[in-house]
UniProtKB/Swiss-Prot annotation:
The gene is elp6. Its main location: cytoplasm. Pathway: tRNA modification; 5-methoxycarbonylmethyl-2-thiouridine-tRNA biosynthesis. This is Elongator complex protein 6 homolog. Belongs to the ELP6 family. The lineage of its organism: Eukaryota, Fungi, Dikarya, Ascomycota, Taphrinomycotina.
Length: 249
């Protein structure tokens, strides 16, 4: 058994795009919190844009990591969920406007956040949760989502984005594949293919993608593609090599 940081660097390399692929059975929420915790701890200006959850949901989970994100001055939350699914009852700190397949409308609050808070590019991170919801709600099509990611990479040194895959969701699979071709690294979580193991959540695969960023020789173990077993805990995840766990058939 080992901790996640022994296999995955706490903060992605500069000028990187990290793709997180999950399923309904194996969501990647713990990876969001892993990156969020370390980015805020490192004083990175961190923008968190979600299309599926509320600030309170993430704040409760992050308290288990020993961090109150609501008090962090370098944390900027953008509520894309309310923009898509709920009428605006009162002005929020940063609220995405109504949109119909228009990139600037969807991501205007992000640009506003960067401009108003004088982000330093070298020390900036954006985490986008469930970007595929933009496609399934017809807010943006796949091509425009990819274009938006390219534009965001001009504003943030590190971009972390996730897509949730599933058998009934062929469009999400296609979107994930398209973003994967743009990414420097992909981290995917999927259920066990057969059998079960006590406490094991599923498989965690770390993969270098076509645009993998390298500056000199990286001495971290993350340079190697690998597949591990993992167990989600209240404050992170425990990781096991395949030989450490016996599956119960």
């Amino acid at each position: 058994m080992s901790s996640l940081h022994e296999h995955l660097r706490p903060i992605p390399e500069p000028f990187s795009l990290t793709l997180l692929l999950g399923t309904r059975e194996t969501p990647v929420t713990f990876l969001f919190h892993y990156y969020l915790y370390h980015a805020l701890k490192a004083k990175e200006s961190t923008c968190f844009l979600t299309f599926s959850k509320t600030l309170d949901e993430h704040a409760i989970s992050m308290r288990k990591w020993g961090m109150d994100i609501k008090t962090k001055k370098n944390f900027f939350f953008i509520d894309g969920f309310s923009m898509l699914f709920a009428p605006i009852s009162k002005p929020s700190k940063v609220q995405a406007p109504e949109t119909k397949n228009h990139i600037k409308s969807v991501f205007a609050p992000v640009i506003q956040c960067v401009e108003e808070n004088d982000f330093e590019f070298e020390n900036s991170t954006i985490i986008i949760e469930d970007i595929d919801i933009l496609q399934s709600t017809h807010a943006l099509d796949s091509t425009k989502i990819q274009q938006a990611i390219l534009e965001l990479r001009k504003c943030f040194s590190r971009v972390i984005v996730n897509v949730t895959l599933g058998a009934p969701l062929p469009q999400q699979k296609s979107l994930g594949s398209s973003i994967g071709h743009m990414a420097t690294r992909c981290i995917s979580c999927r259920p066990l293919t057969s059998g079960s193991a006590r406490r094991i959540t599923g498989f965690l695969r770390l993969s270098r993608m076509p645009n993998h960023f390298r500056s000199g020789i990286c001495e971290t173990p993350e340079d190697d593609d690998k597949e591990l077993l993992y167990e989600v805990t209240e404050a992170g995840a425990k990781v096991y090599s395949k030989g450490q766990v016996t599956l119960q058939l």
